[in-house]
């Protein structure tokens, strides 16, 4: 079974660590690559600088409220790029604002999940994301150059 590569873009280290830990326990081989802001996310996806030797991820979990280039800008840039636009992107944000949900889908997000405030629900949400995207959904796989 091929390892699924996930790009996790979240500026909260505690959330990022917990998400990585939950996905690693999912049962399917998974490698989570974490970055803390939108500039790093785009550099990772374009394999620039220190990310030149990284794999293009199979899936991305993206927070909206990031320092510098926010998640909306990252989403717009990725979905406008002919090489990257097929990358499935799940928004995982503390925002429950209808305008953030609508904007994310308008920009091409594949799903929008609000981060729960309590630990049990947070774990359940990340587990559900993993079960759907790694267990049910078929992820597009491009040949790695």
Regions found by a protein language model. Give the residues of each.
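Conserved acidic segment of CheY-like receiver
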Residues: 3-14, 19-24
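Residue-level signal for the "D+5" position in two-component response regulator receiver
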Residues: 34, 66-69
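Acidic, metal-coordinating helix/loop segments flanking the phosphotransfer/catalytic sites
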Residues: 34-59
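Active-site residues of response regulator receiver
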Residues: 62-63
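Short, glycine/charged-rich "phosphate-handling" switch motifs in NTP-dependent
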Residues: 110
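C-terminal output helix
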Residues: 117-128, 137-143
């Amino acid at each position: 079974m091929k390892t699924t590569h996930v790009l996790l873009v979240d500026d909260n280290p505690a959330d990022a660590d917990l998400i990585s830990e939950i996905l690693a326990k999912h049962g399917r081989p998974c490698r989570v690559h974490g970055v803390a802001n939108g500039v790093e996310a785009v550099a990772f996806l374009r394999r620039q600088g220190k990310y030149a030797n990284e794999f293009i991820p199979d899936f991305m979990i993206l927070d909206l409220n990031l320092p510098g280039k926010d998640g909306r800008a990252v989403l717009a840039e990725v979905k406008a790029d002919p090489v990257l636009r097929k990358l499935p992107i799940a928004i995982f944000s503390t925002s429950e604002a209808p305008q953030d949900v609508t904007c994310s889908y308008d920009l091409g997000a594949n799903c929008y999940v609000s981060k729960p405030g309590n630990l049990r629900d947070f774990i359940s949400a990340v587990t559900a994301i993993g079960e759907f995207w790694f267990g049910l959904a078929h992820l597009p796989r491009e040949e790695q150059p």
